Design a protein with these regions (language model features):
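Internal alpha-helical scaffold of NAD(P)-dependent oxidoreductase catalytic cores
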Residues: 1-77, 82
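NAD(P)-dependent Rossmann-like dehydrogenase/reductase catalytic/cofactor-binding core
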Residues: 8, 47, 59-162
Length: 162
């Protein structure tokens, strides 16, 4: 509480969450959806939310994430539509994973979408959209790595979605 009070006194928002796991899932709903989709599409948050087909895919993936969260005992406090609207309001922002892709850096998708797919396995949740996007990201990561090796740039570790 003292940390939160100090941050608030400094003019920052710093709520103390009683159910941190629920709030983590709210964040993960966005990251596990928009980071991999942005890498596959090259699009900003607003563009993905405005395009009917990527918005539908994002909503489907979020529904899968919510099902996994519920089976894991979490109760995220935001609706899918509210999460999508929030992402769209962020505007023409490129996700950190898309920025990494454009900079030629390793893609850190294992901690993002692969973790959700692992939790789907543990909770016996189908999550076909999440799995399909993870598979496409895994192939992208492998293709990038092969291209770098063939170009003589040396192998760079890539945390791929599997």
């Amino acid at each position: 509480m003292k940390f939160s009070e100090a941050m608030i006194a400094g003019g920052l928002k710093c709520p103390v969450e009683q159910q941190i796991r629920d709030e983590m899932w709210v964040k993960l709903m966005g990251n596990a959806v928009f980071n991999p989709l942005s890498v596959l599409t090259g699009a900003t948050l607003a563009a993905m939310c405005r395009h009917p087909r990527t918005r539908e895919l994002a909503a489907t993936m979020m529904a899968e994430a919510l099902e996994i969260a519920h089976k894991a005992g979490a109760q995220p406090s935001v609706s899918i539509e509210r999460r999508l609207a929030g992402a769209e309001r962020v505007g023409e922002h490129k996700t950190s994973t898309l920025q990494d892709l454009e900079a030629g850096k390793p893609l850190e998708l294992a901690a993002i979408i692969d973790a959700v797919v692992e939790l789907a396995d543990l909770t016996e949740t189908d999550a076909p959209a999440m799995r399909a996007v993870a598979a496409a990201c895994a192939l992208l990561a492998e293709t990038r790595e092969a291209d770098k090796t063939q170009a003589g740039g040396g192998a760079r570790p890539v945390a791929s979605a599997s």
